[in-house]
């Protein structure tokens, strides 16, 4: 039994309570909103609404926090809004400058630790919009020498002026996705394409057997095979780049339902121009704000482009993986870089790990696309309320493909070597070289040559001579793999 000595239980509890209150007062401050007072960590810039969301939506923990590119996009948006509101006479220049400075810090990532909210919150993203408003508000107050929480710079009246969560969140969705695609994804895909193109040129002289249906087919060069991969990546780049066009249309200025209530005429055009200036990308106001709030077809389209790209990258990684299979009992036409041990039980085994990592990324992107597609269909009346999960999955896809493209290029593609002896061995064994005889002896006779060779385990030449369909000289003149690489 717990016993208290030299003091009563009541006195002990009372003194402990006072101690805890003193500790709480030193590490927390009190913020207020329409629901009343709430304690907020003293070292954080966020306010009451962020704190309530933080307490009410403990789903997934830190790993499900709102993506930082979106947070940084909020900084761009809030700075742009302050500039435009000031220019239209709606915001005091002194307050505007403080908001701009604070928003710059958000955009640069300096205040990342002050954005704790997770993706799984209200479907409009209201709480993350208020997180940005509150952080910028309190940081601006601090810049002006005021007391944090005093609302000298108000999160709603000033930081959210001429705005609604319903138009700010879709706007930062587009800004974040566009910046990540333009500055991260496309450059890395271009690097991968260039690496594959270099291999295509390096391997252009190597004639190998083609395969269709996983069966032997007619010859091509290894360079031609790789040229197909180059084109797939180039097509993927073009598809993703095309999605930037629809992402360039911004919902900002639509406010609550698309009517533009509480904005001044021209606000929507001016803020798109200012965001363009801040980011270096071309943005424009959406021609129809009702569509921009209620539907996110541009996000679905962009995800679709990424999904197609994932299909392409899966095929490329899988082909290279198969062509590198072996080393003694597989195709082994390619020799892949050996980066790390491959087995905990089989000594000396090395696996195509980069290919496997890339294909797993592709599967994840396909899954993300499924989530985005369903969420994109869920715009009821004037608002889609699946915004956070849509942008979280889209940014995840962009990040994964960007990183995987780099890893696959550096640790696999650039180090691929052709196993020319093995390639030549398989080429000369192929029965499908018989296709060169079609124009000379006809399809039926050529088919008999191939089947006879396969049945008896002899070469095509031996089979053709045995069947008497041509002479040795004719065979040597007509069946030349190097002459079977294009129209003739």
UniProtKB/Swiss-Prot annotation:
Record-level Gene Ontology MF annotations: fumarate hydratase activity
Gene: FUM1
Name recorded for this polypeptide: Fumarate hydratase, mitochondrial
Recorded phenotype for the gene knockout or disruption: Cells accumulate extracellular fumarate.
GO terms classed as biological process: DNA damage response; double-strand break repair; fumarate metabolic process; malate metabolic process; tricarboxylic acid cycle
Note: Present with 6920 molecules/cell in log phase SD medium. There are 2 substrate-binding sites: the catalytic A site, and the non-catalytic B site that may play a role in the transfer of substrate or product between the active site and the solvent. Alternatively, the B site may bind allosteric effectors.
Subcellular location: Mitochondrion matrix; Cytoplasm; Nucleus
Organism the protein comes from: Saccharomyces cerevisiae (strain ATCC 204508 / S288c) (Baker's yeast)
Assigned GO CC terms: cytosol; mitochondrial matrix; mitochondrion; nucleus
Reactions that this protein is recorded to catalyse: (S)-malate = fumarate + H2O
